[in-house]
Amino acid sequence: MIFSLLFSLAACRGNSEQKVVDPVVEFDSAFYERLMPGLGGGITGGDGSISIDLKDGRSLFMWGDSFFGDVINDKRAKDTKFVIGNTFTIIDKNGQLKTLYSGTKENPLAFIEADQDGKSPVWYWPGHGFVENGILHLFMSKFHKVGEGSFGFEYLCCDYFRLDVETMKIIDKENFKAANENNVHYGHAVLPYKGEIYVYGTRADAMGVAEVHVSKAKLINDKLVDFSYWDGAEWQTDARKSQRIAGITKSVSEQFNVVELEEKIALVSQDRSGNVKDIYSFIADKPEGPFSNEKLLYKVEESGFEVDSMMTYNAMVHPQYRKDGKVLMCYNVNTYSMTKLFEKASLYQPRFIWVPVEKIVK
């Protein structure tokens, strides 16, 4: 399904040294409306909000669970279709949208479906990836249902997919075995850097405090091979020797970002075990760290946060979108109230902000 919008999302990469940079973080209330138009029957609610530059003038936005169907006056119909797993939106340089999912318009399903085990529902939530030579290299996390309620799910594994960027058809997939060897949830941040590909993930302890680990690989014949794992001092071929990256002083979200900004490596995350409303950044000179320069970039302020039983999580950076010395970011919001998801649709739509790059890297 393709929905046309009358706007343009051109990625601006101007020289910030020639402009006066507004030091204030700018809230962009219109951006999610561009990606989630209320009418047209497409995706009108979701989380994840992970983007990848497709390198052809288009960007891919990946959603976790999502709602389909019109939203009128911030309300959605009780029979609105809800998809567990993943759906994608592609937006081109002219602002035209293409929504990717399986199934039918009347019964939409996740775009990349997981094989079922016949015991409990199994699905993929999106990780991250990159594009090279017309191929999207994408990591997806597989989960299954283990109980009732919003958090009745369990991580199973990480799979590495390759897709044709033009058709978005799957070329192949394989299990990323390291994730089950060392319990690191790899693939939630992927960084191409100086001829190698760095794949990051978190490992949480029994209290939910998460540390960041990194592996790196070579891209040979359009496929990631020869993975090694950072042990805190050097790279090892044994995934079980992986150790946390030094210098990250906050518990990092399950989904987070590592991007290159102004020749610095920047990690951005919400505080997983502290105040989840706080969005932090750290910088390093190398992908494996050590990281430093902790910055509180933004504090989430939502009117009705308590009244609407809201939650916020998984801040994302969209480095392909730059303007006036700022980079586009977002954070996800949700509610513990299933009723409110229909009565107030905006409770399940990402919030976009423009953050001064200097605020991160200086």
Give the ranges of each region predicted by the language model.
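Sec-dependent signal peptide recognition
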Residues: M1-S4
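C-terminal motif of bacterial Sec signal peptides marking the signal peptidase cleavage site
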Residues: S8-A11
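Short alpha-helical segments and helix-capping/turn motifs at coil-helix boundaries
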Residues: L35-G38, T44-S49, V122-P126, V184-H185, ...
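Repeated scaffold domains used in trafficking and secretory/extracellular systems
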Residues: S49, G127, N180-A189, S253-F256
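Conserved beta-strand position repeated across blades of beta-propeller domains
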Residues: I52, F130, A189-P192, N257-E260, ...
